[in-house]
Amino acid sequence: VVHNYQYGTLHRYIDERLNKGINVICDIDVQGFKLIQKTDIDHISIFIIPPSIKELEKRLLKRGLDSENVIGTRVENAKEELKCAEEFDYRVLNDNFEQAYEEIVSIIINGKLTKNNDKINIKILRDMLS
């Protein structure tokens, strides 16, 4: 349950695809990540970092999908989730869409992000949390 909504992907669904040699991409939160960590599923984890908390709030408002109360809850949850970002294999800053997209594709295809980019993303993350 996230933001009072229930989300999930059936383990069976993932297993069926993996057994057929099909890679599965899941858009999950930190709770989902921690559940996958407890399984034997071979995975790569990518944490998408917002440019700032203010920018995240601005983007949520611009979407126009949630009330201000829900947005406030989402922002507070994001602050907590950011504390877990360094547990993920990679961190990608979602400041420039095209660049973030290229980094994610590189991680998926090559299984790596340049160490320099990841160090920069970790610094941005730590600055945001301080």
Residue ranges and their predicted role:
Residues 6-10, 29-32, 52, 56, ...:
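Helical mechanochemical/support elements of P-loop NTPase systems and associated helical scaffolds
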Residues 13, 77, 103-107:
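Alpha-helical elements of Rossmann-like donor-binding domains used by nucleotide-donor carbohydrate transfer enzymes
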Residues 62-66, 83-130:
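NTP-dependent small-molecule kinase module
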Residues 1-24, 30-34:
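ATP-dependent small-molecule kinase phosphotransfer cores
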Residues 34-36, 88:
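Extended rod-forming repeat segments used as scaffolds/tethers
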Residues 16-19, 38-41, 83-85:
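Conserved catalytic network of the ASCE P-loop NTPase/AAA+ motor domain
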Residues 43, 53-55, 61-83, 98-99:
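Ras-like small GTPase catalytic G-domain
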Residues 24-29, 38-63, 94:
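Conserved phosphate-donor/acceptor-positioning beta-strand/loop module used by diverse small-molecule
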